[in-house]
Regions:
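Structured-RNA-binding interfaces characteristic of tRNA pseudouridine synthases
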Residues: 2-274
Length: 274
C-alpha cells in the first residue's frame, strides 16, 4: 500500500475505483514506492493525485520486483461519490497524458467501499518467458530470458506437479523477506507452453496461486531450468520444497522474463466505469 502525499485534507471516501494497469518494468525499481527510486506506484500515484487534486492511498494486487513487467496489474484507490462522476473516457485520456509511455491504465472499474485489489484477489497469475536457443531474440528481447541453450521441457513439466497445492514455499523466497513471516502459499496451476512473439518461438511457464513470496516465481523458474539442463532430476523439486531452505533451490531467474498476467476477482465486485 502506498501512503498518501502531504496535501491538505482527505475527504470522506465512499467508494473505490479499481484500475487495470500494464507496464514495462525495465526502467523501474519495482512496483512499490522507495525513497529516491523511480517506481511504478510512484508514477501512478502522481498521475492520479494530479487529476483528483488530493492525496490518495493506492493498493496493488501484487508488488512486482525491479525489471518485472505486467499486462494486468490491478490497483485500488478509495474515492468520493463525486469522483465517481469522472467518466471512463476522462480517466483513460488523463492517465495517457500524465503517465510515462511505459505505463498504461487500460480499464477503470467501480467497486464497493473497502474493496482491496490485494485482499479481495482470489488468485494471481504470472508467466515467465524463455528464449532457449542460440539465436538472440530481437523484438521480444525486453520481455524474455535469453537462455542460449535448449531446455528439456518434458523433464521440467514432470517437476511441476510437486508445486501444486498448499505448502511451505520458503525454499523459493528471498531470505530476508522470509524472516518472521508466513511462507505457506497455494499454487493451483504450474505448466509449460509455447507462444510466438514477433515471429520468435518462446517457451512459457505459467503459474497461478493465491499469492506469491518475494522472488518466488523467478526462483521456481531457476530451479526448473536446472532440471531442464539435466543438472538435476525432476524428483529434485520435491526435495527442494521439503528443505524449506533457500540454499536448496536453484538460482533466481532474471527479472526481465517475468510478467504479471492477471488477477482473479469475484466478477460481481467490479463494474466497468461508464
Amino acid at each position: 500500500m502506498t501512503a498518501p502525499s502531504d496535501f491538505n485534507s482527505i475527504p470522506e471516501l465512499d467508494a473505490t475505483l479499481v484500475f487495470r494497469v500494464a507496464y514495462d518494468g525495465s526502467s523501474y525499481s519495482g512496483f512499490a514506492e522507495q525513497p529516491g527510486q523511480t517506481t511504478v506506484a510512484g508514477e501512478l500515484r502522481r498521475a492520479i493525485e494530479t487529476l483528483l487534486r488530493r492525496p490518495i492511498v493506492l493498493t496493488c494486487a501484487g508488488r512486482t520486483d525491479a525489471g518485472v513487467h505486467a499486462v494486468a496489474q490491478y490497483i485500488s484507490v478509495p474515492v468520493t461519490d463525486a469522483e465517481l462522476a469522472l467518466t471512463r473516457r476522462r480517466w483513460l485520456r488523463a492517465m495517457d497524458a500524465l503517465l510515462p509511455k511505459d505505463i498504461a491504465i487500460n480499464e477503470v472499474y467501480k467497486a464497493r467501499k473497502g474493496f482491496s485489489a490485494r485482499f479481495d484477489a482470489r488468485s494471481r497469475t504470472y508467466t515467465y518467458r524463455i528464449a532457449d536457443r542460440d539465436a538472440r531474440p530481437v523484438l521480444s528481447r525486453g520481455a524474455v530470458w535469453w537462455h542460449r541453450y535448449p531446455l528439456d521441457v518434458e523433464a521440467m513439466s514432470a517437476a511441476c506437479p510437486a508445486l501444486l497445492g498448499e505448502q511451505d514455499f520458503k525454499s523459493f523466497c528471498k531470505v530476508a523477506s522470509a524472516v518472521g513471516k508466513p511462507t505457506h502459499r497455494c499454487v493451483m496451476r504450474a505448466e509449460f507452453g509455447h507462444e510466438v512473439a514477433f515471429g520468435e518461438d518462446i517457451l512459457t511457464f505459467s503459474i497461478e496461486g493465491n499469492a506469491f513470496l518475494h522472488s518466488m516465481v523467478r526462483t521456481i523458474v531457476g530451479t526448473l531450468v536446472e532440471i531442464g539442463m539435466h543438472r538435476r532430476e525432476p524428483e529434485w523439486m520435491r526435495e527442494v520444497i521439503d528443505a524449506c531452505d533457500r540454499t536448496a533451490a536453484g538460482p533466481t531467474a532474471p527479472a526481465c522474463g517475468l510478467t504479471f498476467m492477471g488477477v482473479d476477482y469475484d466478477p460481481a465486485e467490479l463494474v466497468v466505469l461508464d
